[in-house]
């Protein structure tokens, strides 16, 4: 009898342990299912909550850290995402997806060497997955290695010939190499594959605009806006095209539309300020330049153009202060010296004006002696500093996600 009771007790312990183990496994499966569902629905904070619990239940599950990294990446927490991707590949050194997404994250940091190393590791582990070549092509593009980017997009297109995004990316690479014919052919192919994606029309429209084919460019932007009425990048580009055609009110309307959705868009504020000044609405122009400088107090061109607005308003001392700031930020700014000389002459400060004039001439001579071809240089006095700026302006690069192409998702 005693032996029977002992056996039953041991059996009960084993049953309880098994039930506990089953319950724990059920909990893990439940949190994984909830987390992945939230991830697929774009509910990234909710996904992280589930993966946080799961990471405590099982500290060795590399998928948990990987999926949590994906959620953090999509929320913009790139450092947190990288930490989780690091953890996933430490737990499983042959985990392709971990290297893939860590590489993508490194590229977002601008760490292209590390990014390419991770993507190469992923390719070595899984050479048949062409999505890796797409992602590496994007990284090569961001690293301005356009020839290599094209080769990777070629390889991807051979396997996935009906993916319009690959043609858009390869077209952008050709464009940066100056091959506009191949670029427009790729944009045409992308549009043919997906006539309802505004991105193809925006890119082709920008290419047409660069070739001064403004009617075709505006036609493409109109189509992009028809497909996506909230596409601020299309409105912004169409505004510049209208400006080139001297349709200033149409340009102003498009810039206003951008600012409805993105009131802190410095580049759009800057361009609207220039148009307002050109139309004689100096108070409005001054307000926009003030807002630009509140966003970025080291914006050289905003100081330069606000000074011009002050001159039109007869506020010469204010203009001098802004030219001083522009020159302080960029001492080789010949045009700023020239304009400051003009203002000092108006104020009767002739010796100082002559000194600025001489400095401007010296800067111009030095610049021309270098035979610099960069038309965007602040020292190039042939540039129209009162013209609208596109995305070549340093201070504007954060305003639009222009050529930052998307990597392939995990399969």
Q: What name fits each language-model region?
A:
Residues 8-18:
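Bacterial N-terminal signal peptides
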Residues 1-9:
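Bacterial N-terminal signal peptides that target proteins for export
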Residues 2, 21-411:
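Alpha-helical tetratricopeptide repeat
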């Amino acid at each position: 009898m005693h032996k029977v009771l002992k056996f039953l007790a041991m059996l009960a312990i084993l049953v309880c342990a098994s039930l506990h183990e089953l319950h724990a496994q059920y909990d893990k499966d439940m949190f994984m299912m909830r987390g992945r569902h939230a991830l697929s629905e774009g509910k990234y904070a909710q996904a992280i909550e589930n993966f946080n619990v799961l990471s405590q239940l099982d500290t060795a599950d590399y998928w948990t850290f990987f999926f949590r990294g994906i959620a953090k990446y999509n929320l913009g927490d790139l450092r947190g995402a990288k930490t989780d991707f690091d953890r996933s590949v430490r737990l499983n050194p042959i985990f392709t997806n971990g290297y893939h997404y860590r590489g993508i994250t490194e590229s977002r940091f601008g760490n292209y060497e590390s990014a390419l190393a991770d993507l190469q590791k992923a390719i070595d582990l899984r050479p048949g997955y062409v999505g890796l070549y797409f992602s590496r092509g994007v990284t090569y593009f961001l690293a301005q290695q356009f020839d290599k980017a094209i080769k990777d997009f070629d390889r991807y297109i051979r396997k996935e010939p009906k993916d319009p995004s690959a043609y858009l990316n390869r077209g952008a690479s050709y464009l940066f190499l100056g091959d506009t014919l191949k670029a427009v052919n790729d944009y045409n192919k992308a549009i043919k594959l997906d006539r309802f994606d505004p991105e193809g029309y925006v890119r082709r429209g920008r290419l047409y605009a660069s070739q001064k084919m403004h009617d075709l460019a505006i036609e493409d932007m109109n189509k992009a806006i028809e497909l996506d009425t909230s596409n601020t990048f299309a409105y912004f580009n169409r505004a510049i095209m209208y400006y080139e055609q001297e349709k200033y009110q149409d340009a102003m309307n498009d810039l206003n539309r951008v600012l409805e959705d993105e009131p802190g868009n410095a580049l759009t504020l800057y361009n609207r300020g220039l148009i307002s000044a050109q139309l004689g609405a100096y108070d409005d122009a001054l307000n926009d330049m003030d807002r630009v400088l509140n966003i970025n107090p080291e914006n050289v061109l905003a100081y330069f153009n606000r000074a011009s607005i002050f001159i039109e308003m007869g506020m010469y001392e204010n203009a001098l202060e802004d030219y001083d700031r522009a020159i302080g930020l960029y001492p080789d700014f010949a045009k700023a010296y020239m304009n400051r000389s003009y203002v000092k002459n108006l104020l009767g400060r002739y010796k100082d004006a002559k000194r600025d004039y001489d400095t401007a001439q010296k800067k111009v001579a030095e610049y021309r002696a270098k035979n610099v071809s960069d038309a965007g240089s602040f020292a190039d006095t042939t540039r129209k500093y009162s013209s609208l700026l596109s995305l070549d302006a340093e201070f504007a690069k954060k305003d639009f996600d222009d050529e930052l192409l998307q990597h392939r998702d995990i399969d």
